[in-house]
Amino acid sequence: MGLSEDLHARARTLMQTLESALNTPGSRGIGTANPTIYDTAWVAMVSREIDGKQVFVFPETFTYIYEHQEADGSWSGDGSLIDSIVNTLACLLALKMHESNASKPDIPARARAAQHYLNDALQRWDIMETERVAYEMIVPCLLKQLDTFGVSFTFPHRDLLYNMYAGKLAKLNWEAIYAKNSSLLHCMEAFVGVCDFDRMPHLLRDGNFMATPSTTAAYLMKATKWDDRAENYLRHVIEVYAPHGRDVVPNLWPMTFFEIVWSLSSLYDNNLDFAQMDPECLDRIALKLREFLVAGKGVLGFVPGTTHDADMSSKTLMLLQVLNHPYSHDEFVTEFEAPTYFRCYSFERNASVTVNSNCLMSLLHAPDVNKYESQIVKIATYVADVWWTSAGVVKDKWNVSEWYSSMLSSQALVRLLFEHGKGNLKSISEELLSKVSIACFTMISRILQSQKPDGSWGCAEETSYALITLANVASLPTCDLIRDHLNQVIESAKAFLTSIFYARPAAKPEDRVWIDKVTYSVESFRDAYLVSALNVPIPRFDPASITTLPPISQTLPKELAKFFGRLDMFKPAPDWRKLTWGIEATLMGPELNRVPSLTFEKVEKGANGKWFEFLPYMTIAPSGLQGTPISSQGMLDVLVLIRALYNTDDYLDMTLIKATNKDLNDLKKKIRDLFANPTSFSTLNEVPDDRMPTHIEVIERFAHSLLNYPRIQLASDNDKNLLRSEIEHYFLAGIAQCEENILLRERGLDKERVGTSHYRWTHVIGADNVAGTIALVFAFCLLGHQINEERGSRDLVDVFPTPVLKYLFNDCVMHFGAFSRLANDLHSISRDFNEVNLNSIMFSEFTGPKSGTDTEKAREAALLELVKYERKETDDAFEYLVQQLTPHVGAKRARDYINIIRVTYLHTALYDDLGRLTRADISNANREVSKGANGVKKTNGLTTNGTKATANGSNGIHH
């Protein structure tokens, strides 16, 4: 047989196996998840009184965990720190309960080894990075129980963890929990000592709580009346898992419906031919699914009779539609629709992009998609916004793989575009279509940059997710420009997966990509996604059917890649990456045009010119080059600021060129008065249409717009005041620069400059006169807003929480400004002499008779040395700041700070590169002109390709 026949045969066998467990009389179901140490430890702690003695009911499970402790004292699970901590806490508790076991005299020593491991591991645990089900309840519960044995731990996030625990407990309605099934039944072991398990027997289903061995074990431990149903359930699960290794249990059993629905929906989504997959078997599955959906009145949970959830319900409804047993989505919509997205179930901590992607996919398969148009647009907006506001890849709370969210989002969003291309869903706005397009291309860009040399993206299941994503996003016409490279990547991935398909290796810890209390893998899912990835047509849809996206230039991405590819920093990057950044930048252009300017319309000029078409590339490419992606929203925020800075600065340069010293002194006073008034910038002052705005009005409009920017309003007053101060000093420094230029013109360039030393001018006026410092402070205001938004408190915290950190950051800003000023001067020497703008090499330190720099080349070499020095000082200052930050904000948040610094720094490095390139272009052009050739024409600071020849010399606007 060929690969296609083999794929369908594997899919057919999988469905027949799952269907047999579903419909065979007497079957209690099926589950192919790996066994877990955590759940096995809970079962090992179950005891009951027999003949007046307390006896452990499942001693064989304790033997298993006893024999599988690792050399460092831990039980590692998938190898992640959090799983090792949770597993080891549960096993340590089991060891303490079994200490009297005479047949295992080394239990105390083993317990000490576990304690030693936990003492170290808990110090390294950043709970803000953790995504596990109910960890904020489970870990405190285990710690409290260990306290009763005299075992306690102190670690940095202990207080925060217990505050989260107390906050969650305070919100619980125990009477409601005791009354009926809820999602909390899945983790009731976290409430030992709080919950009254005697009030819960009526919630058992087939002897278990939500198919969860750990909760069922906790119930047997704490209920005063023994329940044979629960004991029989646990014994049965141990028997089922005997082939996996003696006397263990998984985190979930049975998973019959979960495995059927997830596996079959994946096979359908990726174009498996159901006619080759035993249609009668599929029909029996559909009838059973419909039976339980009817019983649940249009919704159901992952096990019949358990809490309804949107994930299972949405996928089941979609399957019934394609299997010709349709059921209305009405009850589903009523149950799960929220104001801005669809919820998975009550009590969830946060919304899920994968759940909403599944809901969107399901509604797009409804017989009449337009009936649910408002819900479809709502979910699509939510999913697109998640991608729009996320830096890097989007991770989800149900799967550790960064590609799982990409797969489900791409399937739903591309299907949305396909339906819209058919003439449906007419209320979708052009803005939403644009964001969907950007989201999809963001996925493909990040996947292409992450493929490993063997063609994979990690384990086989993760690689399947990535390949399915590529298949869907390859349907976009924007991918035509990189189609050849895309095909190479896909062939490499298929070769990797084909070898796995035929070899069928045993599951490894790295295959545990699904998130529960600990991570786990599911054999049927691995098979289904593997078959799906190898079968999916690429592209999934004909690009010609995706016709309703806003059109973009087919030539601009190539222009961008070609031009910026000449820069030293981009030369090592392969052509396809440079072209990918060009496509992303081209997609971002319309979004920038959609945002109102922060300046007056009369001041705004050239916003649609080549310079502004090039701007997005100059932010996207440096961040992509160094693997420090920023969100599309963050990208747009930066671009809006750069555009406003450019236009404001350019307007002031043009209109102040003939200003007198008196004019400049008057303007300085107005600036100081404006910024000294605490009520300034609280309201927006308009300018009559019949006149141009004055200089102070332009400055006031810029400052007002920036300080009232919507996405910094939750930044603290201290953070916004720092931004206010940077804006004031920037404009005052610009005036000081103008005053220096007047002196130069009056005195002449051949006269030695006297007054402020070059060092002091560089670190005060020069550093203040760099717009990059405003961009850096503004970026941290954006982060401060995000931090406070996530905290959800009216008590706004500073982005740098201590006096030391504030001082260090301001020191970084000063060094960064000095470096940028010197670098700008280095690349503007010729122009500054031509235009009579003050440049570093005009200071007496460079021009004096004893300076040792009596030639232009020597002066330039000296300035280059200073640039290198200030760059090192800036590097060292930022590095020290980051070192001091981590203990205060945690490793995860510290990475956000680092990314801001890196992206700002790389953006400056790009202008450094651009300056060198432009100097070479101008030099070559002059040589060609002297020979009578055309060369590269320079007009108004533009090369013939339309980009700025250098950064703005007089005010350093783009540093």
From Swiss-Prot:
Residue numbers binding Mg(2+) 1: D649, D653
Cofactor: Mg(2+)
Region (Class I diterpene synthase): 543-959
Motif (DXDD motif): 309-312
Cofactor note: Binds 3 Mg(2+) ions per subunit.
UniProt keyword terms in alphabetical order: Isomerase, Lyase, Magnesium, Metal-binding
Pathway(s) the chain acts in: Secondary metabolite biosynthesis; terpenoid biosynthesis
Positions of the UniProt region annotated as Disordered: 931-959
Biological process terms in GO annotation: diterpenoid biosynthetic process
Gene Ontology MF terms: isomerase activity; magnesium ion binding; terpene synthase activity
Composition bias type Low complexity, residue spans: 934-959
Binding site residues for Mg(2+) 2: D649, D653
Ligand binding (Mg(2+) 3): N824
E.C. number(s) listed in UniProt: 5.5.1.-, 4.2.3.-
Region called Class II diterpene cyclase, residue ranges: 1-542
InterPro entries in alphabetical order: Terpene_synthase-like (IPR050148), Terpenoid_cyclase/PrenylTrfase (IPR008930)
Motif (DDXXD motif): 649-653
Catalytic residues identified in the record: D311 (for class ii diterpene cyclase activity), D649 (for class i diterpene synthase activity)
Annotated domain remarks: The class II DTC active site contains a DXDD motif from which the middle Asp acts as the catalytic acid in this protonation-initiated cyclization reaction, while the class I DTS active site contains a DDXXD motif that binds divalent magnesium cofactors required for the catalyzed allylic diphosphate ester ionization-initiated reaction, with the first Asp playing a particularly key role.
Family: Belongs to the terpene synthase family.
Function of the protein: Bifunctional premutilin synthase; part of the gene cluster that mediates the biosynthesis of pleuromutilin, a tricyclic diterpene showing antibacterial properties. The geranylgeranyl diphosphate (GGPP) synthase ple4 catalyzes the first step in pleuromutilin biosynthesis. GGPP is then substrate of the premutilin synthase (PS) ple3 to yield premutilin. Premutilin synthase is a bifunctional enzyme composed of the fusion of a class II diterpene cyclase (DTC) and a class I diterpene synthase (DTS), with the corresponding domains and active sites containing characteristic aspartate-rich motifs.
Protein name: Bifunctional premutilin synthase
Species annotation: Rhodocybe pseudopiperita
